[in-house]
């Protein structure tokens, strides 16, 4: 087998929360809402450029979780541009952010939480200033 790279990740939640997640990942993280195949369940596919990277899938109330779903997820990271504008947008929305960096690389990391508490990293490789 040859691994060709990252395809997407999926978050599953009830519809009312799914709409909040969609708004967060579009308005805060900067993903774009895009086409989704006509599955029987409702949901959204969010894109970074031409690549679908986040699938939001409806879980019906009381629906059991699959056995392979684990509580070990820590965060997902997105490569981004526009650090200053992003920090201003997050501050204006009152979103709590932890700023960090990767030693020896110049990478700036912003860590935050989505409406369900999932970790999100916004990663910037651009020089500050």
Task: Spell out what each predicted region is.
Residues 12, 77-81, 113:
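Short hydrophobic/aromatic beta-strand micro-patches
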Residues 39-43, 72, 104-108:
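Short acidic/glycine-enriched loop/turn segments that link adjacent beta-strands
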Residues 23, 89-93:
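Short amphipathic alpha-helices in soluble, non-transmembrane regions
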Residues 1-22, 74-76, 128-129:
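N-terminal beta-strand motif that seeds the catalytic metal site of vicinal oxygen chelate
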Residues 1-4, 92-129:
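Vicinal oxygen chelate
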Residues 53, 59-61:
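Short, conserved turn/kink motifs that form compact alpha/beta structural patches or helix kinks used as
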Residues 69-90:
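Mid-chain, well-packed structural core segment of small domains
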Residues 11-53:
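Core segments of cupin and vicinal oxygen chelate
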């Amino acid at each position: 087998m040859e691994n060709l790279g990252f395809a997407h990740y999926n978050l599953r939640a009830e519809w009312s929360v799914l709409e909040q997640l969609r708004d967060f990942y579009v308005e805060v993280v900067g993903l774009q809402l895009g086409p989704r195949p006509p599955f029987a369940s409702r949901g959204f596919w969010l894109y970074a450029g031409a690549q679908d990277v986040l699938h939001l899938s409806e879980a019906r109330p009381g629906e059991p979780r699959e056995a392979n779903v684990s509580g070990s997820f820590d965060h997902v990271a997105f490569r981004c541009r526009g650090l200053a504008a992003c920090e201003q947008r997050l501050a204006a929305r009152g979103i709590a952010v932890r700023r960090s960096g990767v030693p020896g690389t110049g990478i700036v990391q912003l860590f935050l939480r989505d409406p369900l508490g999932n970790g999100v990293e916004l990663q910037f490789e651009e020089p500050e200033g």
